[in-house]
A protein has these predicted regions:
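Short glycine- and hydrophobic/aromatic-rich loop-to-beta-strand nucleating segment
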Residues: 134-135, 247-250, 254-255
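Secondary-structure end/capping motifs
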Residues: 257-352
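Functional cores that coordinate and move charged inorganic groups
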Residues: 199-200
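Short gly/pro-enriched beta-turn/loop segments at secondary-structure junctions
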Residues: 242-243, 285
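N-terminal secretory signal peptides
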Residues: 1-15, 29
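Short, glycine-/small- and polar/acidic-enriched structural segments
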Residues: 38-196, 208-225, 229-242
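N-terminal export signals
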Residues: 15-37
């Protein structure tokens, strides 16, 4: 299903391919070449500020710092908590942040100058697969809207303005939301209103009735269930199994000036990713750490169920999902494939 675009965008096939090349499919060999040409592996910048949003999938950045993997590679990672994706974007562009845990599609949006400043960007690595969800309010669920088909029937029967929230206009959450609504026969621009809300504010906004549904990363989907205000209509891994989600993003200028630093940070985060996925105990330790006020600031119970693949939908259904959030998965997670970038760009074009 491909509803008409609500507005036009001038993006040729050549521009799509050029933008997709932001990914490390092209960057990794170039980075390696620059490192060897420099004659030393010593990081140019010993301290690196990495922005993150309070979401479970910031964990590999946080744990690389907490467990000291960064020191092993000669850098100090300073995780920097940010309030919104727009703030992350602006601080990356200005140089206030060196790198960031960031939405896949946000990097491409900035590279193309869509809905904000334009700057050449780089995707260093993928940070995680899976682990996001679309939540519908308990009010809608009580009226029978518990999945896409029943939501479409309710919206057709009970006509009013329905509001749904994503976290950033070109981000992954917006793309999952638009795709799912359209697949259910709902045009996200003609049949509904879509707003932008920062991830940590989703649950509070649903509680006061500001939206009928939202798409966001964990732990906020599970938090809505725990608080009795929402139900999980679909997980994003049910939309696209093992989909890419967050990346380690930076500017092209930073890579050119600090190739060894980039490599060191990537190695530290890759080691943290491997550590998280290595055991049940490691996942639980990670959940305890990122739940702290300095990071996500929520109860550990909001994190430690879905990170283990233990899901419930808020309506009595429970299941074990083998395709829960993963950070390494035997190395399958972390390479940023060109085809992944192309998918997000085609969705940007589709939705204007």
């Amino acid at each position: 299903m491909n509803p008409p675009l609500n507005r036009k965008i001038d993006m040729s096939r050549r521009q799509l391919i050029k933008a997709a090349a932001v990914g490390a499919a092209g960057l990794a060999p170039a980075l390696q070449h620059v490192v060897h040409a420099a004659g030393s592996d010593r990081p140019e910048k010993p301290e690196v500020r990495i922005g993150f949003i309070p979401l479970t999938d910031c964990a590999s950045v946080v744990m690389a710092s907490v467990l000291g993997f960064d020191k092993k590679y000669g850098v100090k990672i300073v995780p920097t908590k940010e309030a919104s994706w727009a703030g992350v974007r602006d601080k990356l562009v200005s140089g206030e942040l060196d790198m960031a845990h960031v939405l896949y599609g946000l990097v491409y949006g900035v590279h193309l100058g869509v809905s904000g400043p334009k700057k050449d960007m780089a995707v260093l690595m993928s940070l995680n697969n899976n682990g996001q969800a679309i939540t519908l309010s308990k009010t809608l669920a009580d009226k029978g809207a518990v999945d896409g088909a029943s939501l479409a029937r309710l919206m057709s029967r009970d006509k009013r303005e329905y509001t749904f929230a994503g976290t950033f206009p070109t981000g992954t959450h917006a793309m999952w939301l638009y795709y799912w609504l359209a697949a259910s026969g709902i045009n996200p621009f003609k049949d509904a209103k879509v707003i932008t809300v920062p991830p940590p504010q989703m649950v509070a906004n649903m509680r006061v009735g500001n939206m009928d549904g939202f798409c966001v990363g964990e732990p906020w989907g599970h938090r809505a269930i725990m608080d009795g205000i929402g139900i999980t209509a679909v997980t994003t891994q049910d939309i696209w199994r093992d989909h890419p989600e967050k990346t380690l993003g930076t500017t092209a200028d930073f890579v050119k000036k600090n190739p060894n630093t980039c490599r060191a940070v990537m190695m530290a985060i890759l080691e943290a990713s491997r550590w998280i996925d290595a055991s049940l105990q490691n996942k639980l330790k990670m959940a305890e750490t990122v739940a702290e006020k300095s990071y996500i600031n929520t109860g550990v119970d909001a994190i430690n169920q879905r990170i283990l693949g233990r899901y419930q939908n808020g309506l009595g259904k429970t299941w074990d999902d083998p395709h829960h959030m993963k950070f390494f998965n035997d190395g399958a997670v972390n390479f940023p494939y060109l085809s992944d970038g192309m998918w997000f760009l085609t969705q940007h074009k589709r939705w204007g």
